[in-house]
Structure formats: C-alpha cells, structure tokens
Amino acid sequence: MADKEATVYIVDLGESMADCHNGRDESDLDFGMRYVWDKISTTVAASRKTWTLGVVGLNTEETNNAQDSEGLEGYEHISVLQDIGPMTMTQLRELRSSIQTSHTYGGDAISGIVVALAMIELFTKKLKYNRRIILVTNGESPIDDESSEDVANRLNYSNIELIVIGVDFDDADYGFKEEDKSKGKARNEKTLRKLVEQCNNGVFGTMQQAVEELAIPRIKPVRPFKAYDGALTLGDPEKYKSALSIHVERYFKTKRAPAPPASTVVVNSEPGGASQSETLNEDTEMGDAEFSGVKHMRTYRVNDPDAPGGKRDVEFEDLAKGYQYGRTVVPFSESDFSITKLETKKSFTILGFIPFSSYNPFLNLGETGIVVAQKHNEEAELGLSALIHALHELESYAVARYVQKDGAQPQLVLLKPNPAIEDDFECLYDVPLPFAEDLRSYQFPPLDKVLTVTGNIIKEHRLLPSEDLKQAMSDFVDAMDLSGFDVDEDGKPTEYAPIDETYNPTIHRMNQAIRARAVDPDAPIKPPAEILLRFSKPPEKLIEKAKPEIEALIDAAEIKKVPAKAQGRGSRKEPVKPLSGLDIDSLLGESKRTTISLDNAVPEFKQILATAADDATIESAAKQMGQIVRKLIQDSFADLFYARAAENLRVMREELISLEVPGLYNKFLTGLKKSILSGELDGDRREMWFKHIVGGHLSLITQDESEVSEVTAEEAKALCAWSRPNITYRYFRDTA
C-alpha cells in the first residue's frame, strides 16, 4: 500500500449547523468538528510531507472553487478553504478561524464531492496515493442527486474512498435512530447512502459513533526495522568446516514506545511586551511566527586568582573526561579514552544450549527481537528451520552473543523457538539476558516455614498463614480472575484485559492534550478518556461478585482497623492506645526514655517524640539529636560518617515538621553551618554541608513545608548558596 495520502475534508457550514439537537449543548458544527479536528491535528503532529490534506467549505457565504470559475452551474456557495498539501500549525490556526457557520443553504453536497474529487485528481495525478474524501454534514441542505451515479463512477475510476459521516444520521449497526427526522433530511440521508453504496470503497456512518471512537487510542503504525542482516553461527566457520552458518535477518518484535518529547521555545510577544519561555511539543515548527527556537550556549570556567573576577574561561577542546576514583578523579584524554571501549565486530554467535526447565523468566531483560531467514534464500530457510525444529523437539533454548554492528556493545540473548511452530511460521525470538553485574540477589525468609537458630523447621507459627487463610486467599484469587470476566459479541466469556487493549495512558494522554492545545490554545483540556483509566482499578462488578470471598479473607486474616497516627502539635499529648486499653508500659514496668544514644539515635529519637507530653521534652530530644549530628561530623575520618549524620538530620527534620516545631530545626541548622564553615568541627567539613545537606535537600524548613515556619524560600536558598566551594569532576589541559 502506498504511504502517500491525499485527503479532502468537506465541512457543511450551513445555517442549520449552528443548531443544537438531541440534547447536546454544542452545535452540530462543533460536534462534527470534534472528529475533523482530531484527524487533522493527528496529521499535523505526524509532520510527514507525504500526508497531505485539503478542506472544502459547503454552504459558505462566498464561492471559491475551480468549477464555478470555469462557468459551470451548481457549484455556488462552495469554497476551497485549504488547498491540498502538508499542513502546519500556522495553517491549522488560520483554518480554525475560517470554520464558521453561514446564513445560506445553497451549497450542494454532491457538488462539493466533485470539487474535492477534482482537487485530488489534479494533485495526485497518476501517482500512488491513498485518496480519501470525508464529508461531514447534518443533511439539512437540499441535494441534487441527478449526477450521483456519474460521480460514483468517477470516484471508482480514480480509486478514491468516500466517507460520509452525518450528524444524527441513522445507523442500524451502531444502534442509533433519530426521532422526528425532517422529510428533507431523510431524503438527503437516503441519497448520500445510495451514493456510498455505489462506490467500490465507501463508508457511511453516524457522527455519534465517530466521536465515540475518538476516545480509542490509535496505535502508530511502524515499519519493520531490520536491526541485523548477517550470519547466525555455531562455531567458527573460518576455522572449522563443520561450523554452522545461517544467513538471518533480525527485526524488533517489541520496543518501548516513548512519550512525545518537548523542546523549549520563546513565545514572541507583541511589540513592547516581554517574551515568555514555554516548553512545547518537539514537532512544533520553529519557523512559526509565534515561536522562536532556543539555542543553548555553555561556557567552562576555572578559578584563577590572576584573572578578572577570579575566574577564566576554558575552551571545550582543552577539557578531558574524568572518572571518580574514591575521593579523586582520574582524567582520560581523548586519545586515551579509546582504551575504555571494547573492540567488537558485527556478529551473532550461538554459545550453547540450555533446557526449558533451567531458565527463569525473570531473567528476561529489555526489548524482544525476531530472527528469520534471509528473504529468497532457500538454503538459509532450510538451515534455520532445522535449528528451530531441533530446539522445539529437544525443549531447549540457545544462548547467543549478539553484536549489532562493529564497535557496538555485546549482548547475551536467549533464542526461543516460536511456540506456534505448527502454524508454519518459523522464527526465533531473542530476549536480552542480564550480565552478572545486572543481577540483584537477595535473601528472604521462606514463606512456608520458619527456621530456628538450631536448624529446626517449624510449619506452624504465628508468622505463617494458617490453612484457613491459605484457602481463603486461594478462593479470593480465583474470584478476581480476569481471564474470563469480559463477554464478547456472542455472549461468551473472554479476556478482560487483552494486550491489544491495554494502552499506555501517559502516551495517549499527552497526545490528546497536544492535539487539543494545537486546535484551540485557550480551551480547557478535557479529562482523560475512560478507556485510558479502565485498568487503573479493578472492575466494580468483579469486586461486587467477589465480595463473599473478600469478607472471608478478612475474617481468616483477622484484619482489624488500626487508628490513624495523629499529626500536629495538638495531638502529640495523647499517644495512641492499644485496642485492648491496657497500659503496656505500666505492665512491663518500663519507664519512658529520656536520653538518646549515638548507636541507636534514630529509633530512640522517634520513641521520645511519640511519648512526649510537653514542649520541653521535644526541645530536649532535638538538642540531643543535634549534638549527635555534630559529633558524627567531628569524629568522621574524611567523609566516613557524613551519610550517617545526614540520615539523622533527615529524620530530625521530618519529625519536627510533623510536630509543627520547625523553629528547633532551623535554629540548629543555622548554627551547624557556622560551625562547619568556621572549622570548629575538627577541620574542613564543607563537603558535609554542600554535598550531604544542600545536595540532600536538608535545608531550612520553609513556609511551603510548614505553615508555622517563619522562614521563606528565599531565605532558605540564601543559606544554601553562600560560599560554595569549587568542586569539579572535569579536568583541563593547560595549553599555555
């Protein structure tokens, strides 16, 4: 199929299109243009010169078309609003101002189709194009059907698809029928339906269905991308005659779809006004009169006491990349940098085979590829087929080393035979495998037993689920099964969440917002479509159906509601009491903690604050934690205890915010900075301040974080920005 497209939209702008019908609060024109704007904005966003479109206005006040200019009758009140060609953002906004209802009924819909047909024939000539005419009307204007058969024959001859979408047109397949339809509209609707039926490639539908289907995300069609074209080898064919070599091609089977990117531009204001910077979709044309592209310029400076201002500029060519090694940086010149790269050659080599049973699916990493034999190469097809059947019969996978091109990073991939091998589609799927450094091995206690320190195995324990709980959970999982919850057209159970209907809400919500903003920059963006939110929560009907299993699970697990932990100063005097009402501290004879130790500072600090009955206790705890932070910094060998001190400081900050006493933290932090920068804490501890406190976002508590704070964001920023040391990880070569 040709990739070039030529589409002409015919929009009825008659006086009746300004009316509202069937309980809608928008006019027929606005209702129909929801479909047209969506299609046009999608074409503009694609930014492909081969996707062209034009717009014809029907029932316009003026007349502007080639047929009327040639003196032909019956083409009055038809205007070409946009000639066929690629459309830009500027043209889209100009077109928007032209779409206005008129005060006439004089335009004929079939004549409008002839105008659009002639535009397409003139533009496409005899070249390969997907030709399409889309008519949007409410069918209230008179239509002359004498030439409808000739028009249909001409559409068929030019291989043009005709799509007629009517506002409130009857559609038995969709299940819509307009009540109290006027005789004129019914007659026109019948005429247009007959015209579509005479076309080899025609579609007749109602606007209600077209607008409803706009909410369904459209998946961007992609062409097969060949990532590899070469030999798949087993052994070294250059050394051994018995080595296997099959010429294969590799294509992407799954690939992550990114969200639309954005770029920063400057919005050009009116003369005398200030420019404003905005972030827009990258597809925005920078030649637009409203926008100007932003160019980034970067300068490099180093400290130089002899230079004006104490700094001098350094050229980019004099810089060298450096890698952090402990607390120092190891520089690499451009010539030395090649040493760090692994020299590889394009290859696809099988290293060995493993059985199905020894492979864990969680090792799958990254995007999947599909490997097929080279086209029109019978020897390669036979060789790959033999390999696939051998893997399938022996229930084995192949492990291969894949290098896409010379100099590329090598990958380990798992080659899987196509499970549907009996469908005469023979291929290998490759899945990237992790290297040893990519694996994360963690030890967790078993879920079905408890191991004691003496090595005994306990099957019944308070930490293990009972048989009743296991059965209740099993019943709950079965009740929440989605595999057969939905119903197909024949009323049979089917999958509720098939993969081809689980759309990425981020991508399509972004596209929806971009299209809406492109068409009307001032209109509010509508909420996300329901289909994008469908899988954000379990189906309500399924939850209602599984309610008995849910209640049984709650009873078996003995789930009880725990009172929420109260926040704020007014609630700290009343600690949470257990549901039993017993005073655990008095029963155990333990007194409340009043001191904080260095080795267990964080839990003990939280314990004191949880039972604090007055402000003096909180101030004492904050003072003790502050002393511990100072001691950790002072006793630290280099930066050994900096992270620990920062963690204590973070806990102190969070707890004092929750208790609405930010002044204690702010007072301590101000004094801590003076101590650090003055060298009172046994040497130069500025790295603690700038890397761990400022870099860790542990600055003063501002009014944005706590309403009772007296510190503004500007004051907190000023405290962080004072006397920043020169810490850099780039080196430069002195060319003097």
Swiss-Prot record:
One of its GO terms (molecular function) is ATP binding. GO terms for cellular component: chromosome, telomeric region; Ku70:Ku80 complex. Its EC number is 3.6.4.12. Residues 232-479 form the Ku domain. Residues 261-286 are annotated as: Disordered. It catalyses: ATP + H2O = ADP + phosphate + H(+). Pfam families: Ku, Ku_N, Ku_PK_bind. Keywords: ATP-binding, Chromosome, DNA damage, DNA recombination, DNA repair, DNA-binding, Helicase, Hydrolase, Nucleotide-binding, Nucleus, Telomere. The keyword Isomerase does not apply. InterPro entries: Ku70/Ku80_beta-barrel_dom, Ku80, Ku_C_sf, Ku_N, Ku_PK_bind, SPOC-like_C_dom_sf, vWFA_dom_sf. CDD domains: KU80 (cd00873). It is found in: Nucleus; Chromosome, Telomere. GO terms for biological process: DNA recombination; double-strand break repair via nonhomologous end joining; telomere maintenance. Belongs to the ku80 family. Single-stranded DNA-dependent ATP-dependent helicase. Involved in non-homologous end joining (NHEJ) DNA double strand break repair. DNA-binding is sequence-independent but has a high affinity to nicks in double-stranded DNA and to the ends of duplex DNA. Binds to naturally occurring chromosomal ends, and therefore provides chromosomal end protection. Required also for telomere recombination to repair telomeric ends in the absence of telomerase. KU70, of the KU70/KU80 heterodimer, binds to the stem loop of TLC1, the RNA component of telomerase. Involved in telomere maintenance. PANTHER family: KU AUTOANTIGEN DNA HELICASE, X-RAY REPAIR CROSS-COMPLEMENTING PROTEIN 5. Heterodimer of Ku70 and Ku80. This is ATP-dependent DNA helicase II subunit 2. It comes from Chaetomium globosum (strain ATCC 6205 / CBS 148.51 / DSM 1962 / NBRC 6347 / NRRL 1970) (Soil fungus).
